[in-house]
């Protein structure tokens, strides 16, 4: 019985061992088990985006031209979201909407769901790749944990937000100008810039940029000299094995500048990890809140006083009026299927209109 069990286990492991050996072999481009998810999904997501921006119109879903074929450029081309009438359909090529007709599938916006879902799984595959490689070379998994932040933002903006709304139609289209339009939409309909989660996201991203600049400059400033060259690249050997800069000197410098400084490298680098990752996580949470139509700060007392007193105005009340203008223009332009008609007196006016 023992011999039979042993033989069974050996046969079971043979195929797995062969695949494991091939997938995790040391090569120029590591594949790994995560690569089985990453590479196909990344290939399909990028391929779908290039196909859509090159050939596919958004006339049937948004009433827009969105491809190079129609005269768009890199900044104005996009893979647009499906029509609002299609709600949250996965828009499978073989589904009831397209019924296997590739042209019809593209016209309906099927490429958007294709790119969004493959893109999400591709990003997850890339995070798993970092986990897998870290385990292989016996590193801690903080790279993968950090990469969870942009994944959280992508999933919240492109998937969770439209799931909370009436359909994929309200997600961002995949294009530069399309993303800008989505940002304006977020401001006009959700007052996103006054949302505390957005504030935390901005603080995280800009704070991380500041930390990165300070850290890079400090390390360059405190490098040990090991050459006679006149500049950084000639004077320092990029392959020296020992410590290359002085933490003690850096600590003394910033202690004199600010009165406080990081005392060790672990705390310093953890802080550089913590600031941007937490900021992105918080902004992702904020977008989940917007999916449920949770409101940002409302200073109603200022709105009431501004309505009663023509001479009283704050930056907040001015922004509220701007948001109303955005909504009045965008609702009719953005949602032609609703046949929204606003009286002329409620539309904002300006020199360009």
Swiss-Prot record:
Gene name of the record: psbD
Chain residues that bind chlorophyll a PD2: 198
One GO CC annotation: chloroplast thylakoid membrane
Job of this protein: Photosystem II (PSII) is a light-driven water:plastoquinone oxidoreductase that uses light energy to abstract electrons from H(2)O, generating O(2) and a proton gradient subsequently used for ATP formation. It consists of a core antenna complex that captures photons, and an electron transfer chain that converts photonic excitation into a charge separation. The D1/D2 (PsbA/PsbD) reaction center heterodimer binds P680, the primary electron donor of PSII as well as several subsequent electron acceptors. D2 is needed for assembly of a stable PSII complex.
Main subcellular localisation: plastid
Membrane topology designation: Multi-pass membrane protein
Family per similarity comment: Belongs to the reaction center PufL/M/PsbA/D family.
Protein species of origin: Dioscorea elephantipes (Elephant's foot yam)
Subunit structure, interactors included: PSII is composed of 1 copy each of membrane proteins PsbA, PsbB, PsbC, PsbD, PsbE, PsbF, PsbH, PsbI, PsbJ, PsbK, PsbL, PsbM, PsbT, PsbX, PsbY, PsbZ, Psb30/Ycf12, at least 3 peripheral proteins of the oxygen-evolving complex and a large number of cofactors. It forms dimeric complexes.
Gene3D superfamilies: Photosystem II protein D1-like
Swiss-Prot/TrEMBL keywords: Acetylation, Chlorophyll, Chloroplast, Chromophore, Electron transport, Iron, Magnesium, Membrane, Metal-binding, Oxidoreductase, Phosphoprotein, Photosynthesis, Photosystem II, Plastid, Thylakoid, Transmembrane, Transmembrane helix, Transport
Residues that hold chlorophyll a ChlzD2 according to the record: 118
Residues that bind a plastoquinone: 215, 262
Cofactor binding comment, as recorded: The D1/D2 heterodimer binds P680, chlorophylls that are the primary electron donor of PSII, and subsequent electron acceptors. It shares a non-heme iron and each subunit binds pheophytin, quinone, additional chlorophylls, carotenoids and lipids. There is also a Cl(-1) ion associated with D1 and D2, which is required for oxygen evolution. The PSII complex binds additional chlorophylls, carotenoids and specific lipids.
Listed name of the protein: Photosystem II D2 protein
CDD domains, per database record: Photosystem-II_D2 (cd09288)
